[in-house]
Amino acid sequence: MTQDIVILAAGKGSRMKSAFSKVLHKVGGIAMVRRVLTTASTLPESKLHLVVGHQGEQVEANCQDFSANIVWQNDPQGTGDALRRVAPFLQADGATLTLYGDVPLIRASTLEKMTALSNSNTLVLLTISLDNPTGYGRIVRNEQGKVTAIVEQKDASESQLAIKEVNTGILLAPNNHLQGWLAALTNNNAQGEYYLTDVIAMAARDGVDIVTVNPENEAEVAGVNDRVQLAALERELQNQQAVSLMQNGATLLDPSRIDIRGELTTGHDVIIDVNCIFEGKVVLGTGVEVGPNCHLKNCTIGDNTIIKSNTLIEESQVGEHCDIGPFARLRPGTQLANKAKIGNFVETKKAIIGEGSKVNHLSYIGDTEMGANVNVGAGTITCNYDGVNKHLTQVADNVFIGSNTSLVAPVQVAEGAMIAAGSTITKQVGENQLAFARARQTNKDNWPRPIKK
């Protein structure tokens, strides 16, 4: 059955006290509305509609890659009013699923349960029973247990306020009925708004079957109105992701101290120490160990690689059996072949480091192509920038570079060459040559040491 999916994202979100649209605030490193759009996009045969209003330009710009139909609601008058704005774009057949841009943890599996029950004479509601239902619309059922209406908190009687089953706001309605119901909505209520929930009573009146589905947990349908609720959902999501990683064979030394701000994929027997941040798309191979206080962003780490504490890796590719850190920084464009080693206080950028090569301490290697089994001494620098342009340093296999060497790019060092410590290399070094470029040492006898006055 074809579906229209409407995501409501027009609210002002004044309690967030922010210059940004509420739905653009992030949970797990991803804007809430993008999480909802991503989940909605998994449903087949669907057309997305995004209702925007307050700061709608921000929302539209942030979500343009989803190719959703943008519908403006500049003067919001309730959820029913939002659907009425979308009504001209709805397909004649099929059904319309209503979601919310500030309910970011809704699961595709829950929506699939709803769509499985959908047909031209059935309305599907997502409901949940809460110990404290304050603030939610109550689900009213008749003696046979059939849903007959949803009553909002401000319009509910005392007996209705005692009902624990509440409306989550998410519903799936057949389009052949929905158009008429939307046209018949009125704003005769305490808020003076057009409630989408009023279509439930209309469906019951018209003999349409009303069935309910429940989410897996309360967090799945929790909305965000302020930063306290945002923080609570952040913790919930991080806990869910931590549990999933452990169930898939990763060890987290403290599951409460990991932050995943994107997508983290791990092989078996991965070990992650405390206070690590994973941002964007990160892949950790089998047997990878990540020490404490590391930050990995948009990178792939090969099997059995060890990443020691306080290391930053960004937009890099790391091979198998590598050894990185502590206190190392791999900047965008770094590629480490298998068994490469990057030690403490080493920074790389747009650097290809060959198999078995070692940059053990206190070095900067940028815009470099380095072969296999190269040893780079402490304090070595590639001088890649002339003030205007970046230049390439090329180091072939089996090169030994002494400590405190400066390689002034563009420069090439051929296979098997050796560079003496303290050299500044500005010219090509040939195969198996020894290069030294430093001032001659002079020793003066009986030199008088300066005396403090």
Curated annotation (Swiss-Prot):
Binding of acetyl-CoA, residues: A378, N384, Y385, S403, A421, R438
Cofactor info, note text: Binds 1 Mg(2+) ion per subunit.
Reactions that this protein is recorded to catalyse: alpha-D-glucosamine 1-phosphate + acetyl-CoA = N-acetyl-alpha-D-glucosamine 1-phosphate + CoA + H(+); N-acetyl-alpha-D-glucosamine 1-phosphate + UTP + H(+) = UDP-N-acetyl-alpha-D-glucosamine + diphosphate
Positions bound to UDP-N-acetyl-alpha-D-glucosamine: 8-11, 22, 73, 78-79, 100-102, 137, 152, 167, 225, 331, 349, 364, 375
Question: Required cofactors, per record?
Answer: Mg(2+)
Q: In which pathway does it act?
A: Nucleotide-sugar biosynthesis; UDP-N-acetyl-alpha-D-glucosamine biosynthesis; N-acetyl-alpha-D-glucosamine 1-phosphate from alpha-D-glucosamine 6-phosphate (route II): step 2/2; Nucleotide-sugar biosynthesis; UDP-N-acetyl-alpha-D-glucosamine biosynthesis; UDP-N-acetyl-alpha-D-glucosamine from N-acetyl-alpha-D-glucosamine 1-phosphate: step 1/1; Bacterial outer membrane biogenesis; LPS lipid A biosynthesis
**Residues involved in Mg(2+) binding:** D102, N225
Q: Per its UniProt record, what InterPro entries does this chain match?
A: Bifunctional_GlmU (IPR005882), GlmU-like (IPR050065), GlmU_C_LbH (IPR038009), Hexapep (IPR001451), Hexapep_transf_CS (IPR018357), MobA-like_NTP_Trfase (IPR025877), Nucleotide-diphossugar_trans (IPR029044), Trimer_LpxA-like_sf (IPR011004)
Localization per Swiss-Prot or TrEMBL: Cytoplasm
Which cellular components does GO assign to this protein? cytoplasm; membrane
Annotated region (Pyrophosphorylase) at 1-227
Region called Linker, residue ranges? 228-248
User: Which superkingdom does the taxonomy of this entry point to?
Assistant: Bacteria
Q: Which CDD domains match?
A: GT2_GlmU_N_bac, LbH_GlmU_C
- GO molecular function (one): UDP-N-acetylglucosamine diphosphorylase activity
| Disulfide-bonded cysteines | none
Q: Which UniProt keywords apply?
A: Acyltransferase, Cell shape, Cell wall biogenesis/degradation, Cytoplasm, Magnesium, Metal-binding, Multifunctional enzyme, Nucleotidyltransferase, Peptidoglycan synthesis, Repeat, Transferase
Gene Ontology terms: biological process: cell morphogenesis; cell wall organization; lipid A biosynthetic process; peptidoglycan biosynthetic process; regulation of cell shape; UDP-N-acetylglucosamine biosynthetic process
Q: What does this protein do?
A: Catalyzes the last two sequential reactions in the de novo biosynthetic pathway for UDP-N-acetylglucosamine (UDP-GlcNAc). The C-terminal domain catalyzes the transfer of acetyl group from acetyl coenzyme A to glucosamine-1-phosphate (GlcN-1-P) to produce N-acetylglucosamine-1-phosphate (GlcNAc-1-P), which is converted into UDP-GlcNAc by the transfer of uridine 5-monophosphate (from uridine 5-triphosphate), a reaction catalyzed by the N-terminal domain.
The record's note on quaternary structure and interaction partners says: Homotrimer.
What name does UniProt use for this protein?
Answer: Bifunctional protein GlmU
